[in-house]
Amino acid sequence: MKGEFYMALIDIRNLTFEYPGSLEPIFNDLDLKLDTDWKLGFIGRNGYGKTTFLKLLMDKYSYKGSIIKPLPMAYFPFSVNDYNVITLDLLETLQPNFQLWRLQREMNLLEIGEETLYRPFLTLSGGEQTKILLALLFSEEERVLLIDEPT
């Protein structure tokens, strides 16, 4: 119906997590609901669990409790293994099903020239590398974007 919208929630219940050998949990019985349309930032000192929380959302660690996710998650930074390849080839390796027109749209918004795609990734500056990888992330549809320390 016109005017209606669908609110998708990440529903976290009784989340408890601790690293092996830790004296106390990082998260203890956490309950939280996050609307997937929200744009949120976690601010805190080093070692306070921000990256751990994102990795829990990505199912990188075992935990107690439940995390119900209505959409797939996409995590940044990407893990780049080979810096010597042409940038476009690298992007195809990182996200095989991306659509070039969406990537080009995001590149335009981030003011990245299209010639960047045809240069070896290694020759890009650190800022260019970050921007092209963010453009790839932003080009994904129907995903919750988890961005960890993008600078």
Give the ranges of each region predicted by the language model:
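Interfacial catalytic loop of ABC nucleotide-binding domains
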Residues: 105, 112, 116-120
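Conserved ABC ATPase signature
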Residues: 120-124, 128
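A short, proline-enriched helix->beta-strand linker immediately N-terminal to the Walker B motif
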Residues: 137-144
